[in-house]
A protein has these predicted regions:
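Surface-exposed, low-hydrophobicity interaction/linker segments
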Residues: 38, 42-88
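Long beta-strand-rich cores associated with HINT superfamily self-processing modules
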Residues: 96, 108-193
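Glycine-rich, low-complexity intrinsically disordered segments
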Residues: 10-11, 66-69, 95-96, 108
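Terminal, regulation- and interaction-focused segments at domain boundaries
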Residues: 102-108
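Short, flexible, solvent-exposed loop/turn segments with mixed acidic/basic and small polar residues
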Residues: 91-100
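Solvent-exposed loop and beta-edge segments used for protein-protein assembly and interaction
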Residues: 42, 99-101, 144
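Generic alpha-helical secondary structure
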Residues: 32-35, 39, 43, 76, ...
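An acidic, glycine-/histidine-flanked metal-binding catalytic module
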Residues: 2-57, 160-193
Length: 193
């Protein structure tokens, strides 16, 4: 089944006003419930563990295994668009209950073999439960996108946000993912003009 593309809020015609209101409401609800702060705390707790894991693997294999890491918190606009894409009610409660990628970390490795080493080590981190794994290396998306996505849940959390997504890919895979995103965004922008 082909995913329906949702145009970014700024590009929508008459429905833009409704979506803009939904985004504003989501932004306000996220502020009231300190969602960004909770996501950042999850990221801040996970990041040192990934860096330690990288140092350990680099020592074992006598070379740099993890090139770099980045993190992000899903924006209110992206949350609203994803809820629409999944035909879900647009509310903070629904987002927190159903979206497992509000907080995310991307781990860029040197080589494909390293991706599997790092993903395997992340799955076994103490204090986290692996909830879901998507292997887009074995089964790439139609666009050619390749990566491993891990959804983890901290064993002990006092937050409303109970999941963090870790994407692990090689530098070459990351280059393709960035290029694909830019091409897709450029085509959507052209279609809206």
């Amino acid at each position: 089944m082909k995913k329906k593309k949702v145009k970014p809020v700024k590009q929508m015609g008459s429905t833009g006003t409704k979506l803009q209101k939904e985004v504003a409401a989501m932004e306000e609800a996220m502020k009231q419930h300190h969602i960004e702060e909770q996501c950042q705390l999850l990221i801040d707790e996970m990041m040192p563990q990934i860096k330690r894991l990288g140092r350990s693997l680099s020592g074992t294999y006598h070379r740099n295994i993890i090139e770099y890491t980045t993190s992000r918190i899903k924006s209110p606009e992206s949350i609203v668009e994803k809820l629409h894409r999944k035909n879900r009610e647009v509310s903070l409660d629904k987002a927190v209950a159903t979206l497992r990628d509000l907080a995310g970390i991307r781990v860029i490795c040197s080589f494909q073999d390293d991706v599997y080493r790092v993903a395997g080590a992340i799955k076994n981190l103490p204090g986290y439960e692996l909830v879901k794994e998507k292997n887009y290396i074995n089964k790439p998306k139609a666009s050619g996108y390749r990566s491993i996505h891990l959804i983890l849940r901290p064993a002990n959390t006092a937050y409303d946000i109970n999941y963090i997504e870790i994407q692990v890919r090689s530098a070459a895979m990351n280059y393709w993912a960035i290029l694909e995103y830019q091409l897709c965004y450029k085509n959507e922008k052209k279609g809206a003009e």
